[in-house]
Regions:
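Bacterial N-terminal signal peptides
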Residues: 8-17
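Short polybasic amphipathic segments
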Residues: 80-84, 124-126, 161
Length: 193
Protein backbone atom coordinates (compact mmCIF):
# COMPACT_ATOMS: atom_id res chain seq x y z
CA UNK A 1 0.00 0.00 0.00
CA UNK A 2 2.79 2.42 0.90
CA UNK A 3 4.61 1.62 -2.34
CA UNK A 4 1.44 2.34 -4.29
CA UNK A 5 1.01 5.71 -2.53
CA UNK A 6 4.68 6.50 -3.13
CA UNK A 7 4.27 5.69 -6.82
CA UNK A 8 1.13 7.86 -7.09
CA UNK A 9 2.97 10.67 -5.30
CA UNK A 10 5.88 10.38 -7.73
CA UNK A 11 3.49 10.50 -10.70
CA UNK A 12 1.76 13.60 -9.29
CA UNK A 13 5.11 15.27 -8.66
CA UNK A 14 6.26 14.57 -12.22
CA UNK A 15 2.93 15.73 -13.66
CA UNK A 16 3.15 18.95 -11.64
CA UNK A 17 6.68 19.68 -12.80
CA UNK A 18 5.65 18.98 -16.42
CA UNK A 19 2.75 21.44 -16.09
CA UNK A 20 5.10 24.14 -14.74
CA UNK A 21 7.57 23.47 -17.57
CA UNK A 22 4.77 23.65 -20.15
CA UNK A 23 3.45 26.94 -18.72
CA UNK A 24 6.94 28.43 -18.76
CA UNK A 25 7.41 27.43 -22.40
CA UNK A 26 4.02 28.94 -23.27
CA UNK A 27 4.99 32.19 -21.54
CA UNK A 28 8.17 32.34 -23.61
CA UNK A 29 6.09 31.84 -26.78
CA UNK A 30 3.57 34.59 -25.92
CA UNK A 31 3.31 37.18 -28.66
CA UNK A 32 4.13 40.70 -27.50
CA UNK A 33 4.48 42.61 -30.77
CA UNK A 34 1.62 43.51 -33.09
CA UNK A 35 1.01 45.51 -36.23
CA UNK A 36 -2.05 47.73 -35.73
CA UNK A 37 -4.45 48.45 -38.60
CA UNK A 38 -7.27 51.01 -38.38
CA UNK A 39 -9.06 51.79 -41.65
CA UNK A 40 -5.79 51.62 -43.56
CA UNK A 41 -4.72 50.10 -46.90
CA UNK A 42 -4.26 46.65 -45.31
CA UNK A 43 -7.85 46.68 -44.05
CA UNK A 44 -9.05 47.88 -47.46
CA UNK A 45 -7.13 45.03 -49.13
CA UNK A 46 -9.07 42.42 -47.13
CA UNK A 47 -12.43 43.95 -48.00
CA UNK A 48 -13.25 46.31 -45.15
CA UNK A 49 -13.98 50.01 -45.69
CA UNK A 50 -11.23 52.53 -45.07
CA UNK A 51 -11.65 55.08 -42.26
CA UNK A 52 -13.10 54.46 -38.81
CA UNK A 53 -15.59 57.02 -37.43
CA UNK A 54 -16.29 57.90 -33.79
CA UNK A 55 -18.77 60.41 -32.36
CA UNK A 56 -18.59 62.83 -29.43
CA UNK A 57 -21.57 63.61 -27.14
CA UNK A 58 -22.17 66.95 -28.96
CA UNK A 59 -22.68 65.15 -32.31
CA UNK A 60 -19.26 65.97 -33.77
CA UNK A 61 -17.49 63.08 -35.48
CA UNK A 62 -13.89 62.19 -36.16
CA UNK A 63 -12.68 60.01 -39.02
CA UNK A 64 -9.50 58.04 -38.28
CA UNK A 65 -6.91 56.06 -40.22
CA UNK A 66 -3.84 54.55 -38.53
CA UNK A 67 -1.03 52.13 -39.33
CA UNK A 68 1.48 51.28 -36.64
CA UNK A 69 3.11 48.80 -34.32
CA UNK A 70 2.94 48.11 -30.60
CA UNK A 71 5.35 46.29 -28.31
CA UNK A 72 3.58 45.15 -25.17
CA UNK A 73 6.74 44.38 -23.16
CA UNK A 74 8.23 47.85 -23.54
CA UNK A 75 4.91 49.77 -23.65
CA UNK A 76 6.12 51.12 -26.99
CA UNK A 77 4.02 52.34 -29.89
CA UNK A 78 4.98 53.78 -33.23
CA UNK A 79 3.11 54.66 -36.37
CA UNK A 80 1.11 57.46 -37.87
CA UNK A 81 -2.38 58.27 -38.96
CA UNK A 82 -4.74 60.95 -40.08
CA UNK A 83 -7.91 62.52 -38.71
CA UNK A 84 -10.77 64.66 -39.96
CA UNK A 85 -13.02 66.35 -37.38
CA UNK A 86 -16.54 67.28 -38.56
CA UNK A 87 -19.28 69.12 -36.67
CA UNK A 88 -22.73 67.56 -36.21
CA UNK A 89 -23.87 69.02 -39.55
CA UNK A 90 -20.90 67.48 -41.37
CA UNK A 91 -18.93 70.71 -41.78
CA UNK A 92 -15.13 70.45 -41.44
CA UNK A 93 -13.74 71.66 -38.11
CA UNK A 94 -10.14 70.43 -38.36
CA UNK A 95 -7.97 67.84 -40.07
CA UNK A 96 -4.40 66.68 -39.75
CA UNK A 97 -2.06 63.88 -38.79
CA UNK A 98 -1.04 62.16 -35.59
CA UNK A 99 1.88 60.07 -34.40
CA UNK A 100 1.87 57.28 -31.82
CA UNK A 101 4.02 58.12 -28.80
CA UNK A 102 3.46 55.36 -26.23
CA UNK A 103 1.40 52.24 -25.60
CA UNK A 104 -0.57 52.87 -22.42
CA UNK A 105 -2.20 49.44 -22.23
CA UNK A 106 -3.04 46.38 -24.29
CA UNK A 107 -5.22 43.35 -23.64
CA UNK A 108 -4.74 40.47 -26.08
CA UNK A 109 -7.86 38.32 -26.50
CA UNK A 110 -5.95 36.01 -28.83
CA UNK A 111 -6.86 34.78 -32.29
CA UNK A 112 -10.48 34.02 -33.17
CA UNK A 113 -11.47 30.42 -33.79
CA UNK A 114 -11.31 29.69 -37.51
CA UNK A 115 -9.32 32.81 -38.36
CA UNK A 116 -5.66 33.18 -39.26
CA UNK A 117 -3.53 32.50 -36.15
CA UNK A 118 -1.77 35.86 -36.46
CA UNK A 119 -5.01 37.90 -36.52
CA UNK A 120 -5.58 38.80 -32.86
CA UNK A 121 -8.45 40.50 -31.12
CA UNK A 122 -7.73 42.97 -28.39
CA UNK A 123 -7.97 46.41 -26.86
CA UNK A 124 -5.17 48.99 -27.03
CA UNK A 125 -4.81 52.48 -25.58
CA UNK A 126 -2.19 54.50 -27.44
CA UNK A 127 -0.99 57.99 -26.50
CA UNK A 128 -0.72 60.14 -29.66
CA UNK A 129 0.43 63.62 -30.64
CA UNK A 130 -1.74 65.28 -33.28
CA UNK A 131 -1.06 68.26 -35.51
CA UNK A 132 -4.07 69.84 -37.16
CA UNK A 133 -4.85 73.07 -38.97
CA UNK A 134 -6.12 74.56 -35.69
CA UNK A 135 -3.01 73.60 -33.67
CA UNK A 136 -1.44 70.60 -32.00
CA UNK A 137 -2.75 68.50 -29.14
CA UNK A 138 -2.32 65.24 -27.24
CA UNK A 139 -4.93 62.51 -27.36
CA UNK A 140 -5.51 58.89 -26.45
CA UNK A 141 -6.57 56.55 -29.23
CA UNK A 142 -8.53 53.48 -28.16
CA UNK A 143 -8.44 50.60 -30.66
CA UNK A 144 -10.87 47.73 -30.08
CA UNK A 145 -10.84 44.64 -32.28
CA UNK A 146 -13.25 41.74 -31.80
CA UNK A 147 -12.52 39.94 -35.09
CA UNK A 148 -14.32 36.62 -35.43
CA UNK A 149 -17.12 34.92 -33.54
CA UNK A 150 -15.47 32.90 -30.79
CA UNK A 151 -14.44 32.93 -28.09
CA UNK A 152 -16.40 36.13 -27.45
CA UNK A 153 -14.76 39.19 -25.90
CA UNK A 154 -16.38 40.91 -22.88
CA UNK A 155 -19.95 42.18 -23.51
CA UNK A 156 -19.00 45.88 -23.16
CA UNK A 157 -16.41 45.43 -25.89
CA UNK A 158 -17.28 47.25 -29.13
CA UNK A 159 -15.39 47.05 -32.42
CA UNK A 160 -14.10 50.51 -33.29
CA UNK A 161 -11.55 53.22 -32.76
CA UNK A 162 -12.18 56.01 -30.30
CA UNK A 163 -10.28 59.26 -29.73
CA UNK A 164 -10.10 61.28 -26.50
CA UNK A 165 -8.52 64.73 -26.93
CA UNK A 166 -6.81 65.88 -23.73
CA UNK A 167 -8.78 68.89 -22.49
CA UNK A 168 -11.21 68.53 -25.41
CA UNK A 169 -13.82 66.27 -26.95
CA UNK A 170 -14.11 62.56 -26.22
CA UNK A 171 -15.13 60.70 -29.38
CA UNK A 172 -16.25 57.51 -27.62
CA UNK A 173 -19.25 56.30 -29.63
CA UNK A 174 -19.04 54.14 -32.75
CA UNK A 175 -20.47 56.15 -35.67
CA UNK A 176 -19.68 53.83 -38.58
CA UNK A 177 -22.54 53.29 -41.02
CA UNK A 178 -21.05 49.99 -42.15
CA UNK A 179 -19.27 47.31 -40.17
CA UNK A 180 -15.66 48.39 -39.64
CA UNK A 181 -12.94 46.06 -38.43
CA UNK A 182 -9.64 46.90 -36.79
CA UNK A 183 -6.91 44.33 -36.51
CA UNK A 184 -3.87 43.42 -34.45
CA UNK A 185 -1.53 41.20 -36.47
CA UNK A 186 0.95 39.26 -34.33
CA UNK A 187 4.58 39.47 -35.44
CA UNK A 188 7.77 37.89 -34.17
CA UNK A 189 11.15 39.52 -33.61
CA UNK A 190 12.39 37.79 -36.78
CA UNK A 191 9.55 39.28 -38.85
CA UNK A 192 10.07 42.73 -37.35
CA UNK A 193 13.79 43.00 -38.14
Amino acid sequence: MLNRLGFVGLILLLAGSFAVTTASAADRERVTQFDVHVGDAFMLSIGTPAVDIAEAPNGDTIELIFTGQIDVKGHEAEGSGGFRHLDKKGNPVDFGTFTAKRLMSFVDYGPAAGGPPTFHRGRAQIKVRAVGQMGSFNAIMFVDCKFGPAPPPPPEFEEGTFFRIEGGLDFHENANEVNIFNLFVAVTDKERH
